[in-house]
Amino acid sequence: MDVLPMCSIFQELQIVHETGYFSALPSLEEYWQQTCLELERYLQSEPCYVSASEIKFDSQEDLWTKFILAREKKEESELKISSSPPEDSLISSSFNYNLETNSLNSDVSSESSDSSEELSPTTKFTSDPIGEVLVNSGNLSSSVISTPPSSPEVNRESSQLWGCGPGDLPSPGKVRSGTSGKSGDKGNGDASPDGRRRVHRCHFNGCRKVYTKSSHLKAHQRTHTGEKPYRCSWEGCEWRFARSDELTRHFRKHTGAKPFKCSHCDRCFSRSDHLALHMKRHL
């Protein structure tokens, strides 16, 4: 297989040398390469987002029992806090505050994971007993509760939040200004494979594709509609494409640009997959 792209490059050079230009008509080999790339792209598996409605619990009675036990434990802890010495009460109250701050960080991180969506007007400051029971029971899948990857800047901000006292709880505006646009706070849930929530779902019948960006979803939906809005501007060329990167790759056939250079030799290529095939010769 790695001989075919090399033959195609030599043929292109020979045509340009003899005629002075390169024909826009694709060859059978180019059709074959394009088909292989499309098959590799559309047949690869992607992680699917599991909605909360698809999660099945053991029984409603067990869930209700866990909720009652969580409430009783919370009331007992509050009684212990009220009857304990000042030092113990300070430690336990700071522990409860850390739990509440942790739930707050998870809520804020889930809101700021997608920069294209607006933030909700309210923020949840108190820990939810039902949410704690569901998380501790282990019935939720890791794809439902997902948080963005951590960054050094946000870790410093989260340490500042954890360092303040129970009475110095920051306002919603301060929390949003410090965390909006940064995907970094760690929540209680497990992180998804790419670190962000997949919120853009394809609504065509039988399609279960989910994307993190709306632009990627629009490009995917063109495979269902057959729309090709990107047209080649080269004179005499009528080719159209559904994605802008495909148009850019096609336009290099007219200009002869080869931006992909081999790091082991002086060979240059117009496509990254051709360079990858060539790099196998140096292994």
Curated annotation (Swiss-Prot):
| Residue numbers covered by motif 9aaTAD | 62-70
- In which tissues is this gene expressed? Highly expressed in placenta.
Name of the featured protein: Krueppel-like factor 6
Q: Which PANTHER family match?
A: KRUEPPEL-LIKE FACTOR 6, KRUEPPEL-LIKE TRANSCRIPTION FACTOR
- In which compartments does the protein localize? Nucleus
Q: How does it assemble?
A: Interacts with ZZEF1.
- Positions with biased composition (Low complexity): 104-113, 133-148
Entry's family note: Belongs to the krueppel C2H2-type zinc-finger protein family.
Query: Transmembrane segments in this chain: where?
Result: none
Q: Which PROSITE patterns match?
A: ZINC_FINGER_C2H2_1, ZINC_FINGER_C2H2_2
